[in-house]
Swiss-Prot record:
Keywords linked to the UniProt accession: Activator, DNA-binding, Nucleus, Phosphoprotein, Repressor, Transcription, Transcription regulation, Ubl conjugation
UniProt-recorded name of the protein: cAMP-responsive element modulator
Natural source organism: Rattus norvegicus (Rat)
Tissues in which the UniProt entry reports expression: Isoform Tau is expressed in testis germ cells. CREM-theta1- and CREM-theta2-containing isoforms are expressed in testis.
Phosphoserine PTM positions: 116, 142, 284, 287, 290
Length: 357
């Protein structure tokens, strides 16, 4: 075997030895260094290498980024430190975000909590039902005043209707006067009144409210069909208070209706014209206006405004005409004066002209 062949054989053996060692220690940088060191040693004259070199890898541990150091033991017994050129990869600087695990635990409500909520709701309803209503407070306040009739509080639906009263369609508003009469006001404006002896609202009598164009604005005609023992009747109309009195009795201060809440007071006067029997005119302060009356009032105001505007326009035109006439007269006077001055000037010229000659 020639010298070149031996060198190639030694190089291949050393390369195989170094590659097996580096693969076991995860360092690929040792192969090139060992091969170069072995080739340099073969060039010195050592031809036969009967045994393989022992390679041991030791980490430097000096810190991050420092190359690894490999200890190579040659067959002659010498130990050589070989430093790897290829550096080990650094760990990633980017840190993965910390994921927090949240556990959601649902606590099922027990039957005891549901029962306690039901009991609380019942107690709350009882407390609200025990509160006095505004009708009860109004009756307590008006009990000392004899002129104010008491308003009975409407019974709840739970109490039910008495067995001796037949079920019927009751109007929206039911009132009871101080004489014990029931007064019902339907949605259409019909007033119904019942005597104290009748059962409940079965003996209601129909009363009609009509508006007439003959009375002054704000007056309301109330027609009733029945009378009480003393010849007078009292009932309430929603939004106002009306006291109806017979023609034969005189009007006394006690017959004045007392206002309760936001209900204004009205004074009843005996009719001065020939009205039918049982018809009384109630003079209101202007709060009882039907939609037709409101429309008529708006039309009347509009016509009055237009009439005032027409009168103002006529007056303005008249003043302008007078001013123009005054100016024309002044112009005429000035023209006459101008003519006179011209004539005087001519006469003066005639008088002065011979002297100049």
């Amino acid at each position: 075997m020639s010298k070149c062949g031996r060198k190639k054989y030694m190089r291949t053996n050393v390369r195989q030895m170094t590659m097996e060692t580096v693969e076991s220690q995860q360092d690929r940088s040792v192969t090139h260094s060992v091969a170069e060191h072995s080739s340099a040693h073969m060039q010195t004259g050592q031809i036969s290498v009967p045994t393989l070199a022992q390679v041991s890898v030791a980490g430097s541990g000096t810190g991050r980024g420092s190359p690894a150091v490999t200890l190579v033991q040659l067959p002659s017994g010498q130990t050589v430190q070989v430093q790897g050129v290829i550096q080990t990869p650094h760990p990633s600087v980017i840190q993965s975000p910390q994921i927090q695990t949240v556990q959601v635990a649902t606590i099922a409500e027990t039957d005891d909590s549901a029962d306690s909520e039901v009991i609380d709701s019942h107690k709350r309803r009882e407390i609200l039902s025990r509160r006095p209503s505004y009708r009860k407070i109004l009756n307590e306040l008006s009990s000392d005043v004899p002129g104010i009739p008491k308003i009975e509080e409407e019974k709840s639906e739970e109490e039910g209707t008495p067995p001796n009263i037949a079920t019927m369609a009751v109007p929206t508003s039911i009132y009871q006067t101080s004489t014990g009469q029931y007064i019902a006001i339907a949605q259409g404006g019909t007033i119904q009144i019942s005597n104290p002896g009748s059962d409940g609202v079965q003996g209601l009598q129909a009363l009609t409210m009509t508006n007439s164009g003959a009375p002054p604005p704000g007056a309301t005609i109330v027609q009733y069909a029945a009378q009480s023992a003393d010849g007078t009747q009292q009932f309430f109309v929603p939004g106002s208070q009306v006291v109806v009195q017979d023609e034969e009795t005189d009007l006394a201060p006690s017959h004045m209706a007392a206002a309760t809440g936001d209900m204004p007071t009205y004074q009843i006067r005996a009719p001065t014209t020939a009205l039918p029997q049982g018809v009384v005119m109630a003079a209101s302060p202007g709060s009882l206006h039907s939609p037709q009356q409101l429309a008529e009032e708006a039309t009347r105001k509009r016509e009055l405004r237009l009439m005032k505007n027409r009168e103002a326009a006529k007056e303005c035109r008249r003043r302008k005409k007078e001013y123009v006439k005054c100016l024309e007269s002044r112009v005429a006077v000035l023209e006459v004066q101008n003519k006179k001055l011209i004539e005087e000037l001519e006469t003066l010229k005639d008088i002065c002209s011979p002297k100049t000659d």
